[in-house]
């Protein structure tokens, strides 16, 4: 451990405590933090990523959570002697002091700007997979999250699709990779197929997203979106992908949508052949309409 000067020791004691009974990182808390770390998409806490900006830190996970007061002093000295500015140091201490339930008092003592408090609160709650609390802090005015890629991936991998949509809509991070486009489109499609479809058309790999969107709504048995698909002015490539997927299974929603699509595209003969070979389709409303349509054209 680096040797502390007297003024540094006073600051340390003023921030934390030298009493063992005050030390919050017991085995239960330590295990919880390590579990949260393993559940992160890249096995890194947001605090790990922040610590990695300090020159010389190669393994942030070995520093947090500290296993003893000596370890905490070592982390304190690394931050104190680091190449980062005072405001960033205060942000690190604010995050650590949340574990000690002293962060609010500290922020008042050093006049830590509110937007930085909310930013660190957001990261703290993301690290603990408390997504609603995290988003409520990260979407406040003047808060500028600086790890949008990790935030998007974290929300998507934890199936927090509404929060992801809110984050993208409010913060407006550049969706400049296919993975980010994919996370957003496949979140959006769960709530608005039409909005997701229009977004998909502007993406770098629209047909790949189109196939993923169709698979998702079919697998989730989203009948309303399937009805909407049939009425869309699809391109030839989109139609080919759609027909291929619909013909891949004999499940009811696949068959219903395929029959409706064949009727809509005026492929009456193929629609009649499909319905005649399916007991399920013979009972459908689309089949009744199909036979009326066929009798009128005969």
UniProtKB/Swiss-Prot annotation:
It is found in: Cytoplasm; Nucleus. One of its GO terms (cellular component) is nucleus. One of its GO terms (biological process) is nuclear pore complex assembly. It comes from the Eukaryota. Pfam families: ELYS. Transmembrane segments: none annotated. The keyword Nucleus applies. Keywords: Cytoplasm, Nucleus. Signal peptide: none annotated. This is Uncharacterized protein ely5. It comes from Schizosaccharomyces pombe (strain 972 / ATCC 24843). The gene is ely5.
């Amino acid at each position: 451990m680096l040797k502390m000067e007297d003024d540094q020791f006073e600051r340390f004691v003023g921030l934390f405590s030298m009493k063992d009974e005050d030390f919050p990182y017991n085995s239960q808390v330590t295990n919880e933090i390590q579990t949260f770390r393993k559940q992160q998409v890249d096995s890194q806490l947001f605090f790990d990523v922040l610590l990695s900006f300090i020159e010389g830190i190669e393994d942030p996970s070995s520093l947090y959570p500290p296993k003893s007061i000596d370890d905490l002093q070592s982390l304190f000295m690394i931050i104190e002697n680091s190449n980062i500015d005072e405001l960033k140091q205060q942000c690190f201490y604010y995050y650590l002091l949340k574990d000690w339930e002293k962060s609010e008092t500290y922020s008042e003592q050093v006049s830590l700007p509110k937007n930085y408090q909310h930013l660190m609160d957001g990261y703290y709650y993301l690290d603990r997979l408390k997504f609603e609390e995290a988003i409520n802090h990260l979407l406040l005015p003047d808060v500028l999250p600086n790890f949008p890629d990790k935030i998007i991936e974290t929300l998507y991998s934890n199936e927090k699709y509404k929060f992801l949509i809110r984050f993208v809509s409010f913060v407006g991070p550049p969706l400049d990779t296919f993975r980010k486009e994919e996370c957003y489109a496949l979140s959006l499609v769960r709530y608005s197929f039409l909005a997701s479809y229009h977004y998909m058309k502007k993406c770098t790999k629209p047909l790949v997203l189109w196939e993923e969107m169709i698979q998702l709504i079919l697998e989730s048995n989203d009948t309303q979106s399937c009805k909407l698909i049939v009425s869309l002015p699809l391109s030839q490539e989109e139609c080919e992908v759609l027909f291929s997927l619909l013909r891949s299974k004999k499940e009811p929603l696949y068959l219903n949508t395929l029959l409706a699509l064949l009727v809509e595209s005026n492929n009456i003969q193929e629609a009649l052949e499909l319905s005649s070979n399916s007991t399920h389709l013979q009972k459908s409303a689309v089949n009744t309409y199909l036979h009326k349509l066929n009798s009128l054209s005969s």
